[in-house]
Amino acid sequence: MPIKQTINPLERLVVGVATGTLTMSEIAKFMEGVMSARATRYRKLIDVTDCIAGFGEAEVAAFAQVLSNARKDRQYGPLAIVADPKRGELAHLFTTLAGEGLSAKTFRSIHDARAWLSEQSVSDN
């Protein structure tokens, strides 16, 4: 099932909620939406508590490389992932995709994730 996406320019916040089986193509569509809205520098909150991974480590590695290449000319804002601790592979996926040098953190509660994001700065550029 796709990631439901909400982009709020006033708050400079992107919220994604995934349910069902999450595939790499759905993650790619989510990222395309963020990029086309010019919201890469916004804070991002992704809730994956109600989904399961529909991909393997090889797909994650390949997709992370694509994102790394695309990131070279863009600024990225902080990323908060809300995940079920029993399904840590999804949290690991998003922190892997965030890559080095980007601020990403995993939370058990959406409230803690929002609190952390509110403390993070976002570029105006």
Whereabouts are the PLM-identified features?
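Amphipathic, Lys/Arg-enriched alpha-helical "gate/interface" segment within cytosolic domains
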Residues: 1-125
